[in-house]
Amino acid sequence: MKHSVHFGAGNIGRGFIGEILFKNGFHIDFVDVNNQIIHALNEKGKYEIEIAQKGQSRIEVTNVAGINSKEHPEQVIEAIQKTDIITTAIGPNILPFIAELLAKGIEARRVAGNTQVLDVMACENMIGGSQFLYQEVKKYLSPEGLTFADNYIGFPNAAVDRIVPAQSHEDSLFVVVEPFNEWVVETKRLKNPDLRLKDVHYEEDLEPFIERKLFSVNSGHATSAYIGAHYGAKTILEALQNPNIKSRIESVLAEIRSLLIAKWNFDKKELENYHKVIIERFENPFIVDEVSRVARTPIRKLGYNERFIRPIRELKELSLSYKNLLKTVGYAFDYRDVNDEESIRLGELLAKQSVKDVVIQVTGLDDQELIEQIVEYI
């Protein structure tokens, strides 16, 4: 049986990446620091996924195990030494924390003389996630390890898309996911092009597809959350049931379309249909997606290369409209949740400093005109 190592045994790891790896005939070693999840994986060796649609079908994922990377790093290194593929779904901010362990696993492959080519795919909501991870891993590699990695270890970027809401069940491994999923991998950085996963798309140039996803799904989802929170909605479905909010989301997506068409020459009709499907996904009555989950970490989401500021910057450069995106940024700066550290910190920054200084600090912008435009909406 083929072997995989997946970092992140959370809902997305189990409910999306785990399903695809299982359907492709892999044994999956889930690596995490959540002892409850790891123990359950080892005790049961399987878990169930429910598809949130009429009929609510279930998929049983088997041939799984768990490794606690904090308690047993040596087991992770051993797993990396023999594995056929490595994936992650841990969040962009956590990638640097697994870099040293990955590097040790790569060094172990080198010492063992394992020259089987291996690809490491960061399945995260970020542009260039796998290459970002590679830059972190390189810090811990010996010169020999670096040469070995360059020859035998690939870090192809990936774009992933599936809504997996926050949830709690008596069975800690059970997870509910939406029917839709999309996983796209760039081929130009693959070290093992012969290993093609079914239900995964492969593209020579990933950038148009990852931007289409991030600027459409992530920007649209976050827009739903921040505007929804402003109007008191508790779930994304509740937000979309408000015609005013839905209209604003559609206006944001129209601006995103203008950018994607101008930049990547996407077909207008196909992109309109893609955005129509996104709205339908947000309106799935079988998904309870809390606004608080989608809106969390606003400081990160207001970053220079993130889902709002990057498309705004690029639209401005192209002299295209971005007024609705600006309004959403204003709502994001105003968002507060006592359970979200970043939203509280954002409020503290705005209380202590001028709005302009906070905008510069959070967004990383130096375009004075754009900074002033954002300030107007806060």
UniProtKB/Swiss-Prot annotation:
InterPro entries, sorted: 6-PGluconate_DH-like_C_sf, 6PGD_dom2, Mannitol_1_phos_5_DH, Mannitol_DH, Mannitol_DH_C, Mannitol_DH_CS, Mannitol_DH_N, NAD(P)-bd_dom_sf
Oxidoreductase is among the record's keywords: yes
Domain of life: Bacteria
Keywords for this protein: NAD, Oxidoreductase
One example GO MF annotation: mannitol-1-phosphate 5-dehydrogenase activity
Membrane-spanning parts: none
Gene Ontology CC, one term: cytosol
Binding site for NAD(+): 4-15
UniProt-listed Enzyme Commission number(s): 1.1.1.17
Coiled coil: none
GO BP term, example: mannitol catabolic process
Reaction it catalyzes: D-mannitol 1-phosphate + NAD(+) = beta-D-fructose 6-phosphate + NADH + H(+)
UniProt xrefs under PANTHER family: ALTRONATE OXIDOREDUCTASE-RELATED (PTHR30524:SF0), MANNITOL-1-PHOSPHATE 5-DEHYDROGENASE (PTHR30524)
Family: Belongs to the mannitol dehydrogenase family.
NCBIfam families named in the record: PRK02318.1-3, PRK02318.2-5
Protein's recorded name: Mannitol-1-phosphate 5-dehydrogenase
Biological classification of the source: Bacteria, Bacillati, Bacillota, Bacilli, Lactobacillales
